[in-house]
Design a protein with these regions (language model features):
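Bacterial Sec-dependent N-terminal signal peptides
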Residues: 1-22
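Positively charged, low-complexity terminal tracts
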Residues: 18-154
Length: 154
């Protein structure tokens, strides 16, 4: 009887170790272009690029002060769309539009909002094209931080 109990104990212990399987880390298909982390806070906005020239912007939704919810929008670099987005933002620092600039991608709208608060600041945001009422937006960043985000540091 003792041998049978010992046999069952060994079988269950082996079975419990067999439940886990080590997963090898895959290489990320994204290369980080730039990120904004103002005043030692958690990362606010990150720009990454794939081999397919798709730029992913991941930003902390500023609607929630206590929750860290991150949103994304993607820009395919067709006809220099990435540089056009950068130039649109930089031109906005000069023209200071009162209304948000709305850009349309394949499945999202990108909102670029400029605010005047101790200088000109910009906030990036997005919403789905599928009729979602929810618009998200990032924290406001400076022109220098935009240059860092887009990898245009001089």
């Amino acid at each position: 009887m003792k041998k049978i109990i010992l046999l069952f104990a060994l079988m269950f212990s082996v079975a419990s170790f067999a439940q886990f399987k080590k997963v090898e880390k895959k290489e990320s298909k994204f290369t980080e272009i730039g990120k904004v982390q103002p005043l030692g806070q958690p990362v606010q906005i990150v720009c990454k690029k794939t081999e397919d020239n798709i730029y992913a912007f991941s930003y902390r939704d500023n609607a929630y002060k206590t929750l860290d919810e991150y949103e994304n929008f993607y820009v395919k670099d067709v006809d220099n769309a990435f540089d056009a987005l950068y130039n649109t933002i930089i031109e906005g620092f000069e023209t200071k539009p009162k209304e948000p600039i709305v850009l349309e991608t394949e499945n999202q709208f990108i909102y670029i909002t400029f605010v005047q608060n101790f200088g000109t600041l910009v906030s990036l945001g997005s919403s789905d094209k599928n009729g979602s009422e929810r618009k998200t937006h990032s924290a406001t960043i400076t022109k220098k931080q935009v240059e860092k985000l887009f990898g245009k540091n001089k």
